[in-house]
Swiss-Prot record:
PANTHER family: 50S RIBOSOMAL PROTEIN L32 (PTHR35534), LARGE RIBOSOMAL SUBUNIT PROTEIN BL32 (PTHR35534:SF1)
Sequence similarity: Belongs to the bacterial ribosomal protein bL32 family.
Annotated signal peptide: none
Biased composition regions of type Basic residues, renumbered to the chain: 1-16
Protein name: Large ribosomal subunit protein bL32
Length: 59
């Protein structure tokens, strides 16, 4: 069974866990309709990406 050879100090433990926290999702306003959308992704509301219609919106 695996057992740690030495005690891990609180500083090392904190450094290891530094990237474990959840990140806040980034959102931007769509230039076409104003709805919130993920950056570098098509707007799911109007179907536009980078000023062009990529997908016709399903109504």
């Amino acid at each position: 069974m695996a057992v740690p050879k030495r005690k891990v100090s609180p500083h090392r433990r904190g450094n290891r866990r530094a990237h474990d926290s959840l990140k806040v999702e980034a959102f931007h306003e769509c230039n076409n309709c104003g709805e919130l959308k993920r950056p570098h992704n098509m707007c799911s509301h109007c179907g536009f990406y980078n000023g062009r219609e990529v997908l016709a919106p399903s109504l």
